[in-house]
Curated annotation (Swiss-Prot):
Chain ranges passing through the membrane: 78-98
Protein location: Membrane
InterPro entries: Glcn_transporter
Gene Ontology CC annotations of this record: membrane
Any one GO molecular function term: gluconate transmembrane transporter activity
Main location: membrane
Domain of life: Bacteria
Membrane topology: Single-pass membrane protein
Name this polypeptide is given: Uncharacterized protein HI_0094
Pfam families in the record: GntP_permease (PF02447)
Keyword Membrane found: yes
PANTHER family in alphabetical order: ADP-L-GLYCERO-D-MANNO-HEPTOSE-6-EPIMERASE (PTHR43103:SF3), NUCLEOSIDE-DIPHOSPHATE-SUGAR EPIMERASE (PTHR43103)
Source organism of the structure: Haemophilus influenzae (strain ATCC 51907 / DSM 11121 / KW20 / Rd)
Protein backbone atom coordinates (compact mmCIF):
# COMPACT_ATOMS: atom_id res chain seq x y z
CA UNK A 1 0.00 0.00 0.00
CA UNK A 2 2.70 2.49 0.95
CA UNK A 3 4.72 1.52 -2.12
CA UNK A 4 1.80 2.43 -4.40
CA UNK A 5 1.29 5.72 -2.58
CA UNK A 6 4.97 6.67 -2.82
CA UNK A 7 5.10 5.73 -6.51
CA UNK A 8 1.97 7.74 -7.27
CA UNK A 9 3.13 10.82 -5.34
CA UNK A 10 6.55 10.61 -7.02
CA UNK A 11 4.95 10.32 -10.45
CA UNK A 12 2.80 13.40 -9.75
CA UNK A 13 5.82 15.33 -8.47
CA UNK A 14 4.61 15.79 -4.88
CA UNK A 15 7.67 14.02 -3.45
CA UNK A 16 10.91 12.54 -4.71
CA UNK A 17 10.37 9.04 -3.36
CA UNK A 18 12.11 5.70 -3.45
CA UNK A 19 10.84 2.38 -2.07
CA UNK A 20 13.17 -0.30 -0.77
CA UNK A 21 11.89 -3.86 -0.56
CA UNK A 22 13.61 -5.71 2.24
CA UNK A 23 14.11 -9.46 1.88
CA UNK A 24 12.18 -11.61 4.31
CA UNK A 25 12.56 -15.23 5.22
CA UNK A 26 9.29 -16.99 5.90
CA UNK A 27 9.63 -20.63 6.84
CA UNK A 28 6.48 -22.42 5.75
CA UNK A 29 5.46 -25.77 7.21
CA UNK A 30 5.29 -28.85 5.03
CA UNK A 31 7.12 -29.66 1.83
CA UNK A 32 8.68 -26.85 -0.21
CA UNK A 33 6.61 -25.41 -3.02
CA UNK A 34 8.39 -23.93 -6.04
CA UNK A 35 5.89 -21.09 -6.19
CA UNK A 36 6.22 -19.93 -2.59
CA UNK A 37 9.47 -21.33 -1.18
CA UNK A 38 13.01 -20.20 -1.71
CA UNK A 39 16.26 -21.96 -1.02
CA UNK A 40 16.81 -19.65 1.96
CA UNK A 41 13.77 -20.97 3.80
CA UNK A 42 14.77 -24.53 2.84
CA UNK A 43 18.19 -24.03 4.43
CA UNK A 44 16.47 -23.37 7.74
CA UNK A 45 13.42 -25.69 7.38
CA UNK A 46 15.12 -28.95 6.35
CA UNK A 47 17.63 -29.15 9.25
CA UNK A 48 14.76 -28.54 11.68
CA UNK A 49 13.17 -31.73 10.29
CA UNK A 50 16.46 -33.63 10.42
CA UNK A 51 16.92 -33.49 6.64
CA UNK A 52 19.91 -32.35 4.61
CA UNK A 53 19.60 -29.04 2.79
CA UNK A 54 21.64 -27.80 -0.14
CA UNK A 55 22.46 -24.17 -0.86
CA UNK A 56 22.36 -23.75 -4.66
CA UNK A 57 24.15 -20.40 -4.59
CA UNK A 58 27.92 -20.25 -4.46
CA UNK A 59 29.47 -17.75 -2.08
CA UNK A 60 31.48 -16.15 -4.87
CA UNK A 61 28.46 -15.73 -7.16
CA UNK A 62 26.85 -12.79 -5.35
CA UNK A 63 30.14 -10.96 -4.98
CA UNK A 64 31.05 -11.46 -8.66
CA UNK A 65 27.62 -10.09 -9.68
CA UNK A 66 28.12 -6.99 -7.52
CA UNK A 67 31.62 -6.58 -8.94
CA UNK A 68 30.16 -6.92 -12.46
CA UNK A 69 27.75 -4.04 -11.82
CA UNK A 70 30.58 -1.90 -10.58
CA UNK A 71 30.50 1.24 -8.51
CA UNK A 72 28.36 4.30 -9.19
CA UNK A 73 25.67 2.38 -11.10
CA UNK A 74 22.82 3.52 -8.84
CA UNK A 75 21.30 5.82 -11.47
CA UNK A 76 21.41 3.05 -14.05
CA UNK A 77 19.69 0.64 -11.65
CA UNK A 78 16.97 3.17 -10.82
CA UNK A 79 16.36 3.85 -14.52
CA UNK A 80 15.66 0.15 -15.05
CA UNK A 81 13.63 -0.55 -11.91
CA UNK A 82 11.79 2.74 -11.49
CA UNK A 83 11.30 3.89 -7.93
CA UNK A 84 11.21 0.43 -6.35
CA UNK A 85 14.44 -1.36 -5.48
CA UNK A 86 14.57 -4.89 -4.07
CA UNK A 87 17.53 -5.28 -1.79
CA UNK A 88 19.17 -8.70 -2.28
CA UNK A 89 19.81 -10.92 0.71
CA UNK A 90 23.26 -10.36 2.12
CA UNK A 91 25.18 -13.55 1.43
CA UNK A 92 27.48 -13.35 4.48
CA UNK A 93 24.39 -13.44 6.71
CA UNK A 94 23.22 -16.59 4.93
CA UNK A 95 26.65 -18.15 5.47
CA UNK A 96 26.38 -17.33 9.20
CA UNK A 97 23.01 -19.16 9.29
CA UNK A 98 24.49 -22.21 7.59
CA UNK A 99 27.52 -22.34 9.92
CA UNK A 100 25.26 -21.98 12.99
CA UNK A 101 23.06 -24.85 11.80
CA UNK A 102 26.13 -27.01 11.16
CA UNK A 103 27.47 -26.22 14.65
CA UNK A 104 24.15 -27.23 16.22
CA UNK A 105 24.29 -30.57 14.40
CA UNK A 106 27.68 -31.51 15.90
Amino acid sequence: MSELLINDYTRKGFVDGLCLRLPTICIRPGKPNKATSSFVSSIIREPLHGETSICPVAEKMAFSFIKFLGKKKEEWALAITGYVVSIPIVLPILIIFIKAILDLGK
